[in-house]
């Protein structure tokens, strides 16, 4: 304070001597130089514009007023925070009574809650902790949180600071779903003669049966099935009554069926593409028979022997020619196995006519029939001359060695048992 008075007196003395030029020259110059030095240092340090002594007094007064206003504002904030905390505590205290009042007004009865005191104390402690944390973080609290009886927080939001009414939101109990009872039953160890109507009759006395399914395989019933009932209560009663009962000497087991598990096995598509289709199997057998017949007819000796014995060649013409070509192309040994033994031109011409007959050409069919008749007469005449092979009778060469094997070779070389099993397969469905 003394330093401030000295500065004021010095400034007054300097202002009084400012009118005298002599005094200005003698006394004001050292003061002005000192002031300039101090102003230059202040400018270098704070980078601010220098001010006079009179302005510094005003600046100090303004700073003091600002500090006082800031302190008053902080006090007001502290008072408002205390009022807010008190209101929150009062609201938390009155919330359980408000809830009980609402329940009493709805039911018309007074419900005593033994855990209300403990919940109230716990909610007050939580509110105090939340208020302290909000005061530290500098955030205003929107509304209190009330902990319910089940340990789930129930948010209470204030509609406004004037009315003070609170709207309490509680979780909806209808959203919680409980497990339903069993409806589908698994029945095992049933008699093998049982069918769906028998199993349905056994369960109809307990309630309405919506579906019955007994599992079968190729040999018949597998001895178990599934029963689906309309109501879970009926299914449970049927399970309790029938489980362990004896039917035709077999102990019936009834249990709750688990969820169906669909296998990832790829099922073949039905129709022509199915290899187990009877029509497809018959077509494959016909193609195999035609290929075997064509391989046999490539040899002139075998062809003439078959014609002499009256082997039918016309049924082989009923299959289209492209099937024969596809079958021959699929067999790489067909050309090696079917190399004809060229003994004369007549046999080669007969073979060519027979091959052209497979194409369903009418002219080729007539030529094949004519060649068949001619060859039959020739073989009948040659048989009367004797069976000693010679160079002049090349058509009968080797016939005495092949007479026993030609009858078997004329038949198609495929097995009939797989075809019969395919056609006569038992399907219980």
Swiss-Prot record:
Designated name of the protein: Sex determination protein fox-1
UniProt function note: RNA-binding protein that regulates tissue-specific alternative splicing events by binding to 5'-UGCAUG-3' and 5'-GCACG-3' elements. Also binds to poly(A), poly(G), poly(C), or poly(U) stretches of RNA. Plays a role in the sex determination pathway and X chromosome dosage compensation, and together with sex-1 is involved in making the distinction between one and two X-chromosomes.
Domain of life according to the entry: Eukaryota
Entry GO terms, CC: cytoplasm; nucleus
Domain RRM: 183-259
Record SUPFAM superfamilies: RNA-binding domain, RBD
Subcellular location: Nucleus
Gene3D superfamilies reported in the protein's UniProt record: 3.30.70.330
Record has S-adenosyl-L-methionine as a keyword: no
Region (Disordered) residue spans: 156-188
Tissue spec. comment: In males and hermaphrodites expressed in a subset of cells in the head and tail. Expressed in the pharynx, intestine and in muscles from the vulva and body wall.
Compositional bias segments (type: Low complexity): 156-180
Organismal lineage: Eukaryota, Metazoa, Ecdysozoa, Nematoda, Chromadorea
UniProt keyword annotations, A-Z: Differentiation, Nucleus, RNA-binding, Sexual differentiation, Transcription, Transcription regulation
Disruption phenotype: Males and hermaphrodites are viable and there is no change in brood size. In a sex-1(y263) mutant background or a sex-1 RNAi mutant background, males are viable, but hermaphrodites have highly reduced viability due to failure of the dosage compensation complex to assemble on X chromosomes, and the surviving animals show a reduction in brood size. RNAi-mediated knockdown results in a 63% reduction in the number of eggs produced. RNAi-mediated knockdown together with sex-1 results in hermaphrodite embryonic lethality.
Single Gene Ontology BP annotation: dosage compensation by hypoactivation of X chromosome
UniProt GO MF annotations: mRNA binding; poly(A) binding; poly(G) binding; poly(U) RNA binding; pre-mRNA intronic binding
Subunit structure as annotated in this protein's UniProt entry: Interacts with sup-12.
InterPro entries in the record: FOX1_RRM, Nucleotide-bd_a/b_plait_sf, RBD_domain_sf, RBFOX1-like, RRM_dom
Naturally occurring in which organism (per UniProt): Caenorhabditis elegans
